[in-house]
Amino acid sequence: MKVSFCIPTYNRVKFIEDLLESINNQSSHSLIVEVCISDNASTDGTEESINIWRDRFNFPILYQRHNENIGPDRNYLSAVNMGTGDYCWIFGSDDILTKNSLALME
């Protein structure tokens, strides 16, 4: 089973790394994970950080940066539309996945 973590963001680079760490640190599960980040024209270096994190984490990170702010509702839809998983789990960019959450999903 594949799970898409759909994350809309805007100028939250300081928080996204903690969220990605919490996803990466999940254990005892056999789920396929992808992360889909829709960036609402951030100006805080989010795109540069995403490029570094792609090499660091054990799951694909799909990233789309909008050239202008499209509003929160369209940014959420953009993140969801990127996902290819059987399930979509929408996370705020400042959320943290609790330990063993993916194992409990199975």
Label the model's feature ranges.
Residues M1-E106:
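Nucleotide-sugar donor-binding/catalytic module of glycosyltransferases
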